[in-house]
Every structure is written in structure tokens, then in C-alpha cells.
Amino acid sequence: MKIPSIGYVFFLIFISITIVSSSPDHGEVEDETQFNYEKKGEKGPENWGRLKPEWAMCGKGNMQSPIDLTDKRVLIDHNLGYLRSQYLPSNATIKNRGHDIMMKFEGGNAGLGITINGTEYKLQQIHWHSPSEHTLNGKRFVLEEHMVHQSKDGRNAVVAFFYKLGKPDYFLLTLERYLKRITDTHESQEFVEMVHPRTFGFESKHYYRFIGSLTTPPCSENVIWTISKEMRTVTLKQLIMLRVTVHDQSNSNARPLQRKNERPVALYIPTWHSKLY
């Protein structure tokens, strides 16, 4: 539906109050062996909030992620603007965190990153979940990429992309030799030569925007989520590579869907595309 004036004002107020009143976020844990994704397991998603006091938000939070993105219930916003980035080449390290593969950029960032509501967020790391954690109109995809950014005052903003099976993903192709070394040697990390985030095609003309949480412990809230509506492709070989490399004998590292609790979700569409919705 097109965003009504009252709904639009409510969305802006909700975003502004949430960001201003929130405290700095706690980042994702580096060692993921302390929890797992077994549905009924003692360390599974249902019990994450009980494993450590600092992880309590995983069980009691009201703005948790992932969620289902339903086009029939979004507020269409033509004013957010294209999703653009300003990145610089940076050295990086690929690390096996226990349940996913993470690429961490040296110095904690790769250039300027992104700007949201006048605040700069620098790129900290990239990691992948399979299958996707968020769903689109109830549909789950084979892979979801998370680009985790952080502001100077410690607030998080995540940019995510969905993947379907198809042609090889160029960025993952450039990482294959490093992932193979981790798989063969069981080492926990590999240094990567100069990486330019621009190689994985960042810009998006349509995206969802909402406030949520980190999808792994400590599940910190007040995270600004930006999820591209435009689909990427990945081969089955690349998909298997990302799972085999972590050595956790699991075929999934996706947290179950969480309740929206009446949170507003905006969908940015350029004005010249508005007639399509």
C-alpha cells in the first residue's frame, strides 16, 4: 500500500525515538561455539536468553530479528533514497566463528561505509546465514548475507541481501581459495589480501527498513536493518562451501522468525517505480 501521511509520520517518529533513546549496542560474539541452532537443544535458539545474563535480550526482547517481510503490510516510502555506500579497499581476515564464516576488516572498517539519517556507519564485518533468516512474503531463500556496520557511538546497522540458486556470486568466487584452506587445515582464520567491498555490488533501488536486533547472541536491539529487495544468485557449490568450512556438522545457521510486535516496516521505492505497487 502507498504510505499514508499519518503512517509515514508515525514511522519517522518511531525510528527517531528508538535511535535517540537507545544505548550503544553490544556486538555479535566472536566465539559462536557457546550456542547452536538445534531447535530443541539446550543451547538452541529457544534457550539463548538463558545461557548467559548478557544474552537475556534473546529471550525477552520486543524488537528481535529476523522477521517476515510482508509487502501487504509495509509503508511505502519514496523519500529514503537509493542505498549507496562509500567504501575503500581494506585488508581483511576470514574467520570461522563456529557456526558461520565472517570476513572482518582490519582496523574495524573499510572506508566511510554508509550514512543513515545523517549518521555514518562503518563496515565492520560480513557473514552469511543459510538458509536465509528473514523471509519475504513467507518465502525463505537459500542464503542471506549480513554486512554489519557500526557508528562512532557503538550503534549497529546491518545491510542484508537474499540469494537464490543460479549463477556464481563473484565475491564468493574471490574467497574460494581462502575458504578451501580453512576447510582443509581446520584453521580458524585466513588473512585475505586487499578487499574492496565494491566488488559485491552494493547499490539497491528497492529495500526494506526497520528496527530490529542482532540475530545471534547477545541479540542486542535498536539495530537499523536495511534489506535489499533485489535478489542475488549463488551456486549450490558455493552454498555448500560456506557450510562445510565451519565444521559444525549442521546444515543450517538461521535463527527462527521472531514476532514483529507491531513494528513498522518501510519499503523504499523510487517515485518513478511507484505505479508498480
Curated annotation (Swiss-Prot):
Transmembrane segments: none annotated. It is found in: Plastid, Chloroplast stroma. GO terms for cellular component: chloroplast stroma; stromal side of plastid thylakoid membrane. N-glycosylated. Residues 33-269 form the Alpha-carbonic anhydrase domain. Zn(2+) binds at H127, H129, H146. Its EC number is 4.2.1.1. Glycans are attached at N91, N117. Residues 1-22 form the signal peptide. Disulfide bonds join C58-C219. It catalyses: hydrogencarbonate + H(+) = CO2 + H2O. The active site is at H99 (proton acceptor). Its cofactor is Zn(2+). Its main location: plastid. GO terms for molecular function: carbonate dehydratase activity; zinc ion binding. Keywords: Chloroplast, Disulfide bond, Glycoprotein, Lyase, Metal-binding, Plastid, Signal, Zinc. The keyword Kinase does not apply. SUPFAM superfamilies: Carbonic anhydrase (SSF51069). InterPro entries: Alpha_CA_prokaryot-like (IPR041891), CA_dom (IPR001148), CA_dom_sf (IPR036398), Carbonic_anhydrase_a-class (IPR023561). Belongs to the alpha-class carbonic anhydrase family. PANTHER family: ALPHA CARBONIC ANHYDRASE 5-RELATED (PTHR18952:SF217), CARBONIC ANHYDRASE (PTHR18952). This is Alpha carbonic anhydrase 5. It comes from Arabidopsis thaliana.
